[in-house]
Amino acid sequence: MAKELRFNSDARARLEQGVNALADAVKVTLGPKGRNAILEKLTGPPTITNDGVTIAREIQLRDPFANMGAQLVKEVAMKTNGVVGDGTTTATVLAQAMVREGLAAVEAGANPMRVRRGIERTVPVVVESLRSHSVEVGSSSDLRRIAALAASDDEAIGDVIAAAVEHVGKTGVVTTEESDTLGMAVDVVDGIEFDHGYTSGYMVTDPERMEAVLDNPLILLTNKKISQVQEIMPTLEVAKRADRPLVVIAEDVDGPALQLLVGGNMHKTMQSVVVRAPGFGHRRVAELEDLAVALGGHVIAKDTGIDLGEVAREHLGSCDRLTATESDTTIVGPRGHQNLVDARVAQLEVQRERARIDADRDILDLRIARLTGRVAVIRVGGATSVELKERMLRVEDALAATRAALEAGIVSGGGTALAQAHRVLDAVELVGDEAIGRDVVRRALSEPLRWIAFNAGFEGGDVVDVVADLPLGHGFNALTGEYGDMFEEGIIDPFKVTRAALESAASIAALLITTETAVVEEILGQPGAIMAPGFGDLAEGMVRPSNIY
């Protein structure tokens, strides 16, 4: 198949067009006075949001070269969202600034590889500076402010999330659900979470959030690999007779067995989801036994003497609700006997006291927390479906920011921490084109503050100049238009979010700066159609593969 190519400055310019198109659409949402974007949906009402990653997901450009640039910046937003769940707009703004400054330096004759090396050597210095100035979350008011700021300064969301986190503590789990009411409420229920998710995307029940949510399921627990239909059929028959969905938590499910389960979901004859069992090696059976006690079931394994062909109803666990994503699983309302759970926790606490290795103690702490933890469910409502979706996105952003703050502390917010981080760069001794890479980072650090001020109706450049000379931690309050101590005014950002945004942006910018060739499929026939050997013009008007994220 023929390809279309662009080289050198032409390739970089076309890629930069895509970077700018996506970043310009996203950065207007930055800050407490950021604007909204309205996104068309082919079915249902449009979505109104100021969530950076949600906007980025919707952007595809007609020019395939520019579209590649847009998709790379989309990767910045997606990666940041995947790591911390917030900070996507900041990451996009930083990436655009680094690409702009870096490409300008390359076009002026700088060696792109040395510029890249300068960026890669500078960013860790900035991260360590931010880490050294971060402080632990000290009170519920800090949690409330972090959540409110991440939700576009919505105090109601801040109050709800702070209440949820206080209920469950640092080791607890907080989830969100849509509600039929107009407001928001917090329900605290018994629950368990572990870090493995579903094995097949065909089993999701909510394609928009890519989650599989099953109410009142039966749960099979096994450390075996299931491949054959006859191995899973007895369990399926039990679930079918009970008219309940099935969750399979196993080492792996593949082959005909997986095809049978996926087919049941696709034809809506049997709802099920396969989740990879937690733990590794010899610890897997132990962690499955923890789940069996909590869920009121049994582990199907050689050690227990129960075979997959002998599974009956009493061998299966159950719960009120199970939610699985690609990376983790949350079980709400496990139905095991509390006296057995208490006995299991006591047994694990004895093992922890006898453990001599820190790693073993950490794993036992996690298992104890999993069995004793609670789950807070934030129920979010709205007057219309559009308002509900917009509020859900802000609640999820705020929840992610709060978790990040609890995990790694907070820094001064409103773009202040990044804008003042340039002070440590004078000590970074680089020469030649590597020094240019350092200056690329230096100039990009002030870009989030510039756009926060601009979106609030102020001259961004003037604000950046003033904040650069203020004492450390003092910055610009975009709501009042005044300068002050960011911590005292409650304008704070999670360190983990700020770090993830900077590192993701620098990674993509360094790749774009060193690009010399861009290759896309040649457009033939109708715009958007592609040619395939032996098939001719495929699906006239079909979206190009390069446009699909």
Curated annotation (Swiss-Prot):
Keywords: Chaperone, Cytoplasm
One GO MF term attached to the UniProt entry: ATP binding
Compartmental location: Cytoplasm
Cellular component aspect of the GO annotation: cytoplasm
Source species, domain of life: Bacteria
Signal peptide: none
Gene Ontology biological process terms in this record: protein refolding
SUPFAM superfamilies: GroEL apical domain-like, GroEL equatorial domain-like, GroEL-intermediate domain like
CDD domains referenced in this protein's UniProt entry, alphabetically: GroEL
Function as written in the Swiss-Prot or TrEMBL entry: Plays an essential role in the productive folding of MimA and MimC, and thus in the formation of the active MimABCD complex.
Family, as annotated: Belongs to the chaperonin (HSP60) family.
Protein name: Chaperonin-like protein MimG
Organism placement in taxonomy: Bacteria, Bacillati, Actinomycetota, Actinomycetes, Mycobacteriales
